[in-house]
Amino acid sequence: MKAVTAYLRSLNPRLPRAVWLIEAGGVANSLGNGIVLPFLIIYLHEVRHFGLATSGLVVSALGGVGLVSGPLAGRVVDRIGARTTLMGSLALLAAGYGGFPFVRHPWQALVLAAVAGFGNGGFAPGHSSLLASLTSREQRTAAYSLQRATDNLGFGVGGLAGGLIATTRVPSSFTLLFALDAGTFLAFIVLLAFVPAPRAVPAAIRATGRYATVLRDRAFIWLMVVVAVLVAAAYAQISTVLPPFVKEHAAVSEAGIGVIFFVNTVVIVAAQLPLAKALEGRRRMRTLALAGSIFAATCLAVLATGLWLDSTAAVVVLCAVIAVFSLGECLHGAVQNPLVADLAPEHLLGRYMAVRTIAWQLGFMVGPALGTLLLARSPAALWLAAAGACAAAAVGSLLLEGRIPLVAARTPRATRVPSKAFRVEWRTVTMPLDDPLSTGAKPSPHQASEASPLRGGGRRTT
């Protein structure tokens, strides 16, 4: 029992108070996203009576504008700071989503989608950069892992809450959804008011920041290629193409699909921090290669399930498959953002995070488009191609390992702060050198001067 208790205590990430405030805001934000995003097309199509194509265009505009505004957001982060950028992005998101209840015409929805899209474009670079700025290298893996776990928890709970609130029979129920979503963004802004601004980079150094410098970092750019491939071939296929595939080929109901994705949420929430802990001291690119290998295997397992099983048996097997896939997500999540933060020079952190966001957005733009095209022609080709792409990304991760700087090659071991025991510090009375009774001997050093550097040092930020 003591061993179990000690292990659970070791999972405590021991993060600064400011980081916990950001994580709390992240929970609120993901809760709001879960409340609205799954029901946005339903609202536009069935409540506002827009065509399906028009409704889809509005949702696509959210991602498209975010893709365009992402590079600008990276510059803004490096110029005025991550916290200010994040607060501005949240204000745009609140205004954009908060205005949807007043939509009556498609052009109004597109305008609001553009406003929210600009907010989306700035949110991820601002959020990720702020976490990196307020943590040391040793704390970042835990901070980003906690963010991933809480985001999944918030989105899952939000989706459940949204499903219980929204009904097309009562159009005003969607007004409540959008109001709650806007409220979560505003709540995050309030929490950020209590987060100290990170140490500013000197203006002379900030002025030298260019995207050209980022693009010349070949190791980082190839890392982003690997990330984009994994997002397109794994994340996008599982989140968008898996549901229609298993519904058509394995007779899995909507309820069964919901159970499968609930397993995904539970596993990530439960396993992210323990896996991050287990990865301390491990090579990051090998961990990323392992994640790619897991994604490849699960794509093949999804194909086999669709071909050979159906109904309840398919749901049971797919739950196990998605549980394994979720472990791959945890491995990927424990490596990606901390590695990007460690590769980025301090004055280019926002730009590096913006490029990372663009890699994800490109993956989610290309993945569903290619996936649905292949699904219509040959489901087997879809999942075989996805598995092959994930395997190629795994090999690419191993080939890239030699290009990663040694200081960033391994996941740092978390700094362990010993528990504070009661201690009396004896103070030695020493005589001044100019005292007439002095023998001329030098004063002895204070005992505290040889104490652990943890005493009185402050948290190091990078």
Predicted regions and their residues:
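Juxtamembrane intracellular "pre-TM" segments in multi-pass secondary transporters
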Residues: 1-17, 195-229, 414-435
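Cytoplasmic helix-loop-helix junction between adjacent transmembrane helices
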Residues: 112-153
